[in-house]
Amino acid sequence: MVTAPAVALPNIPVALSPLVLGTMTFGDTVDRAEAARLLDMALDAGITGVDTANVYAGGATESILGELLPKRRDRVVLATKAGIAHPDQGGHAPLSRAGLRAALEGSLRRLGTDHVDLFYLHQPDHVTPPAETMAAVAELAAEGRFLALGVSNHAAWRIADLMRLADELAAPRPVIAQQLHNLLARRIEEEFTGFAAHPAAHGLRTMAYNALAGGLLTGRYQEGRAPGAGRFGTSRLASAYQDRYWHDGLFAAVARLRDVADGAGIPLAALALRWLLHRESTDAVLIGCSGAGQLRANLEAAAAGPLPDDVLGACDEVGADLRGPMPAYHR
């Protein structure tokens, strides 16, 4: 298991492991039997975090976890999310008072539990006033529906605003942010990581998702070739992932990073995971998988420790070229 420290989150009795099992593939490209095998492997390896969302596989992911987790519920930090349109909400905006309550109640029903440990606001709702969202958060927390609040895909200024509203409305502050971060997606470093480290963020933790860029950082995909089975080809989110990553500049960066990995004598996927996991700004990394081999490889990479300084420097050179020469707006 990875040597990075576990993360203590307020009100949650189980410490969050530095690797967290992402389950978005469960019920999509991974069937129930394989999901059970992957969950067993993860828990046996010391992973305590299990992450899902109400929209994953149309709710099937939560239903599968509801069948698999009951006997092990006290061993895990169970997280789900709401904030993307879902039938449970009955047409209400995702983060409205009615929409948020309906979404969480639907998740709890599928998960077969009366509460989750960690409840994320999945993405900003550009219709609902944030004060309404945080008032709903306060109500649900008071009812014991969740133990701690997280946010995902939120800019630093939005999180700061939610923290202000939390204090005004006696709601729980967000204690962790789940953000897109990998060797090809480093925008988080431009502002969010500085905010999270500042006292004004009240000790906000950071969990990175898409560590392998949906599989692009495994080197299995090639520009100009059909993706075949997997996240970019056959999953429910294939179109969204192609929009995010299927670009000439990113394929060129992958080729350069593959050379870096080859020079260091490690697989490209291991390079990507070790680079992310051992950054000072990273508290936990979400790892998804579609099979036991992938999960085993991720666990082995995480146990290998930090990358050498020269390899880190080579990775940063690729990242700098991806950013380009455009100057920052802030100082």
Where on the chain are the PLM-derived regions?
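N-terminal binding-site loop/beta-alpha segment at the start of enzyme catalytic domains
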Residues: 1-76
